[in-house]
Amino acid sequence: MISMKKVNYAAIDIGSNAVRLLIKCVNEENAPELMSKVQLIRIPLRLGEDAFTVGVISTEKEKKLIRLMKAYKQLMKIYDVVDYRACATSAMRDARNGKDIVQQIVKKTGIRVEIIDGQEEAHIVYDNHIEQLFASGQNYLYVDVGGGSTEINLISNGELKNSRSYNIGTVRMLSGMVKEEEKEALRTDLIGLATEYTPISICLLYTSPS
């Protein structure tokens, strides 16, 4: 039997509702189908409650975030993580002090955080091999509803045809901070995609539980 070296990788998602750490084990051939989940931790900091209403993340929540990132760094050491990617999404994009907080995180924890735009966020959803979930020769609209934004990916015949992101999410909606023009843009785009790609199946993923 051939023994393959296994290594652990981590992903940190600083979202509008929660901050997640996912650690997965892969073999040396980096075959996605052989990946296995080692650990998943989700802590609800609700950064979007500040970012979407007052435009900044409070000092209290910034301190909690930094403490949490220190804990995540220790967990990555315990699990012998060889590499990681840390991304911040809608709340940190909107917060005026988002970039300053990222600088404090790297200064106090050594963890490098990227504030990614909505388009990159949508592509990351697709890069999670979601096309493998769907039958070839058909059209699918994959909708990922988060706390601060909603990403849609149009997949036709196993290929990504369109990716878009909208500032519509559960935390924004509960805070009453979703703009009417954003709702109209989503509605118009959905009608357009459904008209162009007929018939179409919709897969709805809700990634921002309370």
Predicted regions mapped to residue ranges:
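ATP/pyrophosphate-binding catalytic subdomain of soluble kinases
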Residues: G176-L204
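Phosphate-binding loop and its immediate beta->loop->alpha context
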Residues: Q39-V82
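Conserved phosphate-binding catalytic cores of ATP/NTP-utilizing and phosphoryl-transfer enzymes
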Residues: K5, D117-L141
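Gly/Thr-rich phosphate-binding beta-strand-loop-beta motif of the actin/hexokinase/Hsp70
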Residues: K5-N30, G137-N162
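Conserved small/polar residues in nucleotide/adenosyl-binding loops
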Residues: Y206-S210
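Short glycine-rich, Thr/Ser-proximal phosphate-binding strand/loop in the N-terminal lobe
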Residues: V19-I57, S156-E182
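Metal-dependent catalytic neighborhoods of phosphoester/phosphodiester hydrolases
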Residues: A95-D100
